[in-house]
Amino acid sequence: MLRAEKTSPWRGAYEFTVDGAPVSSFSSHWWRSGGRMTIDGRDHEIRAGRWGGTYTMTDTTDGADRVVATAERVARKHWTVTADGRSYRFRRASMWSSEQLLVEGEQAIGSIRKLSWWRGGAEAELPGLSLPVQLFVVAVVLSMWEQQSAAASGGGG
C-alpha cells in the first residue's frame, strides 16, 4: 500500500512510503500546481498546464526532460493517465467523495483516498502501475485536493 503523509501542516511536503518503507518525497509548489520528487535517485518535476487540467511528470536528471507520464482532464469526473505505453482511467467515486478510483472497463480495481481531512495525505492501492507512475498519480491527486481546498477557503464577498 502506498501512503503519502504530510510532513508539515504549513507546507505542501509529503513523505511517500510503501508498506512502511520510505520510497520518495514530494514537495509541491506553493504558487502553482505540481512539484518535485526524487525516485530511485532520479529527479522528477511535475508541472500543471495553464488551467490545471493537464499534468506532466518529466525526468529532469542530467537536464534530459524526458516525459514519464501525463494526466489529462484532472479534477473532472473521468480522467486519464498515460505512461509506460498504456492509458489508465480514473474516476471520482461519487459526487460527494474525494476518493478517486482506478477503473478497468466499469470495474474499480484500485483507489486513492484521503488519510485525513485535517492533516492531508493519501493512501493508494494502484495495481498494475509501476512505482513511478503510482507516485505521479498520487502527487497529482494531492495537488488537485490542495487546489480544491484553497478554492473552497478563498470565498469571500
Q: Over which residues does each language-model region extend?
A:
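Intrinsically disordered, low-complexity proline/glycine-rich segments
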Residues: 1-157
